[in-house]
């Protein structure tokens, strides 16, 4: 059986410090006979020497573009939209192009033109249809952290100020310490403890959000944990404007009625101050929180909702929340992905990879039909 060569490309998305392969997983894959190249990345949370010590061959950032075709290129986030050259390799990454997101056809056209292949990390599933690896827990954890910080900021600052820029933390403990400090300062102003409504509370993301809320001192009685049972009646829901913080953790797989809308939010009695849209399906035509239109970033974490009644309301819609805790999130994800990566030598027959390839082929066929290729 031919040995597999993986090439870890340097992430190019601003402030993306996570990695699809960690030094830990690199060492384990090399022990299984893999050959691994790692690009030197100035923004990675991992020092390049950690990869070198794990046995990887270090190469310059961007060198994947001219690498031999037999290398499988692995990364996390999408490539720059300004890149249009054909993609000739097999790629493992999150491409965000299977749910009709803005520009999805352009992404797939690059693979079609280069005869490359995409194995989308979002759609690598086990035999039960569950994702083999996801950042959901740390997305929920980080989203809840910023949600509490924004709510607390509003208690201690005037409405003409917005939550300032945030940057990645070295570890979970440091993040929890900062959020707890902000939370206690808010309570010291006389603010009552917030009520937090989480939709999708039973999944990975929801459990991460709940874990953070507990760790910073929000009582469990103040956390409304909604899932399919509570949302089955269909939105919009009157309970959302009456919570102080609303965290959306659902994975959008089909069109649903919106959870809330401007009519519900333009209420002088609204308590809601902060919405955290962890799913951040900003460009999805079926976004269940149609009250904002931009994805926010760490440099500017919130966007104002243009309400006409009630207190100031902001949305946090960062689509790479786990990057707030890049080291722990990467280790967590890479550990779960490892068993599937170990099957790459059998990717023509291993169900997890066969399913991913079929899905890629199906969406490429859609592009070809629409462009009459």
UniProtKB/Swiss-Prot annotation:
Q: Where is this motif: Microbody targeting signal?
A: 371-373
Q: How does activity depend on pH?
A: Optimum pH is 10 for the forward reaction, and 6.5-7 for the reverse reaction.
GO CC terms in record: cytoplasm; peroxisome
Name of the protein this chain belongs to: Saccharopine dehydrogenase [NAD(+), L-lysine-forming]
The pathway it acts in is: Amino-acid biosynthesis; L-lysine biosynthesis via AAA pathway; L-lysine from L-alpha-aminoadipate (fungal route): step 3/3
> InterPro entries, from UniProt?
AASS, AlaDH/PNT_N, AlaDH/PNT_NAD(H)-bd, Lys1, NAD(P)-bd_dom_sf
Q: Which organism is it from?
A: Saccharomyces cerevisiae (strain ATCC 204508 / S288c)
Statement: the UniProt record of this protein carries the keyword Metal-binding? no
The record's PANTHER family line, in alphabetical order, gives: SACCHAROPINE DEHYDROGENASE, SACCHAROPINE DEHYDROGENASE [NAD(+), L-LYSINE-FORMING]
């Amino acid at each position: 059986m031919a040995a597999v060569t993986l090439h870890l490309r340097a992430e190019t998305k601003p402030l993306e410090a996570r990695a699809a392969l960690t030094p830990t997983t690199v060492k384990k894959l090399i022990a299984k006979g893999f050959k691994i190249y790692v690009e030197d990345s100035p923004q990675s949370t991992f020092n390049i020497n950690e990869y070198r010590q794990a046995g990887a061959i270090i190469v310059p950032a961007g060198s994947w573009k001219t690498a031999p075709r037999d290398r499988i290129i692995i990364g996390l986030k999408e490539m720059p939209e300004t890149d249009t050259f054909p993609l000739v390799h097999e790629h493992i990454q999150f491409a965000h192009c299977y749910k009709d997101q803005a520009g999805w056809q352009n992404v797939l056209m690059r693979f079609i033109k280069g005869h490359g292949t995409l194995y989308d990390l979002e759609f690598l599933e086990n035999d039960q249809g569950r994702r083999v690896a996801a950042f959901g827990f740390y997305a929920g954890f980080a989203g809840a952290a910023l949600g509490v910080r924004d709510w607390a900021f509003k208690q201690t600052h005037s409405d003409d100020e917005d939550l300032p820029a945030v940057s990645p933390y070295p570890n979970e403990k440091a993040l929890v310490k900062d959020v707890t400090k902000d939370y206690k300062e808010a309570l010291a102003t006389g603010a009552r403890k917030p009520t937090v409504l989480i939709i999708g509370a039973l999944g990975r993301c929801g459990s991460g959000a709940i874990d953070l809320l507990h760790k910073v001192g929000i009582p469990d009685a103040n956390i409304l944990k909604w899932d399919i049972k509570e949302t089955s009646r269909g939105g919009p829901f009157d309970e959302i404007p009456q919570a102080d913080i609303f965290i959306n953790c659902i994975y959008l797989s089909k069109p649903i009625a919106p959870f809330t809308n401007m009519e519900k939010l333009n209420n002088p009695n609204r308590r809601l101050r902060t919405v955290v849209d962890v799913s951040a399906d900003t460009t999805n035509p079926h976004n269940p929180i149609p009250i904002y239109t931009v994805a926010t970033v760490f440099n500017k974490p919130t966007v104002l909702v243009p309400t006409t009644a009630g207190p100031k309301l902001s949305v946090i819609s960062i689509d790479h929340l786990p990057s707030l805790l890049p080291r722990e999130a990467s280790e967590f994800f890479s550990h779960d992905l490892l068993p599937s990566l170990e099957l790459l030598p059998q990717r023509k027959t291993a169900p997890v990879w066969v399913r991913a390839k079929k899905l890629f082929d199906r969406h490429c066929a859609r592009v070809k039909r629409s462009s009459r290729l």
